[in-house]
Amino acid sequence: VSGGGTEQGPGGVEPANDAEPGVVASSGRGRRRLLIVAVAALAVILLVAGVAVVRQLTEPEPPPVAASPTPTVSPTPTPTPTPTPTGHAPDDRSYDLADLPTVDVFAVIPALPVDDAPEEGTTGEVARPVPAGAPVFAEPGAAPVAALPHELPYEGSIVPIIEREEHWVRVLLVGRAGVPSAGVAGQLTGWLRATDVDISVLDTSIEVSVSAGTIDIVRGGERERVPGEFAWGTEATPTPIGRTFVMSVRTASSLAYTRGHPIVYLAVQSPTLDGFGGIDVAITAFHYHDVHAGPISNGCLRVGADAIARLTQVPPGTAVRITP
């Protein structure tokens, strides 16, 4: 239809871009150039990445660092302790007892020690030499200084043990180490070899308390009070204090003051008298006397008739402990 209408494009549809044809061509070429550059850059990136991957796959890993070995500590062996000896070594030597002084009530043997712990008790045992007798030692391992026979005229061969070892026993003895005038007093002691003695239990002992005025016989832990009061030594002639033992029990008819009662002789002697009654011993004892109270004697323990009757029943070797 002709007339005054607007011209349309082909198909009657208005074009979307009304730019000039030359400008459109130039824009297309720029896009292609950018695409080529991008592809080239991508190729370079892939090439570099591939090289890195190949290198990572082909290069050997560094060897692992070896861990420092932990030093082996060898344990120090614990030394085996040396056994502590339980006593003195045995002595198997033979000795001629005939060459040694005899331990008896009259003996004075300076080589033997006096009791250094008179306030102590005993083991509750007694020792008696075998029939051949026993050498007596001041110290185990030294040469013997005396001999203790199996039997003695005035007894005293059954002795209480105050210390016991496997091979040795320490005992109380009759006799003296010296005399009071020379400054020596106290209960005599010595060591015996265990192989030279027979050992037995004696569970009886006598305990005297001067201050309490009591005499007890102790047997198996049970105490029996000896009846009556008793007398003891004066200040000048005191009763010996400490441990000793019953040497013998016998009657002395020549001593009228005993009225015929037996005397219980003790091993310990006076701490102040060298002798008594014209002889060179100053033995102490339990004995009867009509007057038996207070500090009036020469060291003996004077008792009444009932008391001496009971005391004479204890066997030789019975331990006696006298306290102030």
Identify the role of each PLM range.
Residues 143-144, 176-179, 221-225:
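Short, surface-exposed beta-strand-loop junctions and turns on beta-sheet-rich folds
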Residues 38-50:
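Hydrophobic membrane-insertion alpha-helices, especially the h-region
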Residues 75-83, 175, 199-203, 250, ...:
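Exported/periplasmic cell-wall-interacting domains
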